[in-house]
Regions:
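A short, structured surface patch at a secondary-structure boundary
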Residues: 20-78, 82-88, 181-184
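Flexible loop/hinge segments that line or gate small-molecule binding clefts
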Residues: 88-93, 97-120
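His/Asp/Glu-enriched short active-site or ligand-binding loop at hydrolase and phosphoryl-transfer sites
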Residues: 45, 171-192, 238
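Short, solvent-exposed loop/turn elements at domain surfaces
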Residues: 29-34, 49-54, 162-167, 217, ...
């Protein structure tokens, strides 16, 4: 009987064991905190251009370097049970394997990938019920964002030198469609195709949205672009939060809502 009870205790301990996670992917960090599993993170990679939610708790975590250049030595020193990689740190996989450290890369390109990754992280951290709740909240958030569509057309420029837009089958296009904006960027296998001022004029969008490497001064100085409806009516919006808007964690719901409200305010101004 005592042996049986001991086995039960051991099984319970294993099933509720806390992971020691080093997380190099910002979206996974946010998802883990939203699952209530933040205490299982022992190290992260820092970002230089944007914050990671929740910033007050993130600042207390051990850094293993930057997002683009994490340190293998620092990661190993934390004795993680699992390292969650980003697309920028896939080159660490072999080195981690040599030290007997497991790693995982959670690819994410679309909204559906967020739900899949919530489920995976919930299983890893023994937060399955929290995962189901978070997926449900995420789905409801997506549906809510479809309400009161903006009913406009737009081209979202990634940069203006050269002129590069987010293509019509990108995550950004999915975001625009969700809030009722017709994306007039071209269909392309290239995620951010180069386009011409002539193309923009021909499409003549209601709105021009400027992203990470685009600035309004260049557009207003371009004779062709000055003929577009967007510039004539002053419907140009610079989104300084483009990077964080494209981060595929459940926090994207709040970020899209903020983005949508900013575009609505521009229209009403």
């Amino acid at each position: 009987m005592k042996k049986f009870l001991l086995i039960l205790v051991l099984l319970f301990a294993i099933s509720n064991a806390k992971e020691r996670l080093v997380v190099l992917d910002p979206a996974s960090i946010e998802t883990l905190f939203m699952l209530g599993a933040g205490e299982q993170i022992v190290g992260i990679a820092n970002l230089q251009h944007s914050n990671i939610y929740p910033s007050d708790k993130i600042s207390q975590l051990t850094s293993v370097g930057t997002f683009s250049n994490p340190s293998l030595e620092k990661i190993i020193s934390l004795k993680p049970s699992l390292v969650i990689l980003s697309s920028y740190s896939l080159n660490l996989e072999e080195g981690l394997k040599n030290f007997g450290i497991k790693s995982l890369y959670l690819k994410a390109d679309r909204f559906d990938d967020i739900k899949k990754n919530i489920q995976i992280l919930a299983q890893i951290t023994h937060k399955n019920e929290e995962g189901k709740r978070l997926i449900s909240e995420f789905e409801k958030g997506l549906e809510s964002l479809k309400n009161d569509p903006l009913n406009r057309s737009a081209i979202y420029l990634y940069s203006n030198n050269p002129l590069m837009a987010f293509n019509d089958n990108s995550l950004m296009a999915e975001i625009l469609t969700l809030i009722g904006i017709k994306n007039l960027s071209p269909k392309s296998q290239i995620e951010r195709p180069i386009i011409s001022a002539e193309f923009i004029l021909k499409q003549n969008p209601d709105l021009l949205i400027l992203g990470i490497n685009a600035n309004q001064a260049f557009l207003t100085q371009n004779a062709l672009l000055n003929q577009t409806k967007a510039i004539k009516t002053g419907q140009i919006y610079t989104n300084e939060k483009t990077r964080i808007l494209l981060r595929l964690s459940p926090k994207i719901i709040e970020r899209i809502a903020e983005f949508k409200q900013a575009l609505k305010s521009l229209k009403d101004s």
